Amino acid sequence: MNQLTSLYLAALNRVTWQQPDDIEFPAPLAQQWLLEQGSLSRRMATQCEHLTVDLLSNQIMLADTLSYDETQLLASEEYLLRQVIIYGDQQPWVFGHTLIPRSSMHNQPFDFTQQGKIPLGLTVFSADNVKRDALQVGWVETELGRLLARRSRLWMNNKPMLVTELFLATSPIYSKERV
């Protein structure tokens, strides 16, 4: 695990998760991004010429590595851990941390273990039966400044996954003007 990945994971572990109604959003644009119910990947793609993914981790993990919070949102079983950095025009915008229970990977139209450098949101939101719940947002102080984060449970064909996103300093979510 490289130093930046460690920094991002440590930041996510320090986020105080809140319900969207309980947080003061820094700007309407940030609120729109954090409360996005559709594909964040699609939203990001509209803000740049080239949206790319750097795959940091894509491996099956044991259930005992889940945090308490994660076990409250997902079944305690083996899961696929997918960690990525999503870039817009070669600028790091989002660190993504996704947990997909093994049972959620069965009978799906896609093989998530082979997702590779394709943004997960593009795959998930191309399915017919997708919904988001348990949306939480928060701030975290890092060496790179104060960063926003969100996590939510996505249901694809009635099977859950937990998606957590840390919005990096160069992300358009922090733009002063509407992008």
Swiss-Prot record:
InterPro entries reported for this sequence: Chorismate--pyruvate_lyase, Chorismate_lyase_/UTRA_dom_sf
Annotated protein name in UniProt: Probable chorismate pyruvate-lyase
Binding-site list for substrate: R82, L120, E165
Key words of the record: Cytoplasm, Lyase, Pyruvate, Ubiquinone biosynthesis
HAMAP family (alphabetical): UbiC (MF_01632)
Pathway: Cofactor biosynthesis; ubiquinone biosynthesis
Subcellular location: Cytoplasm
EC number: 4.1.3.40
Organism this protein belongs to: Vibrio cholerae serotype O1 (strain ATCC 39315 / El Tor Inaba N16961)
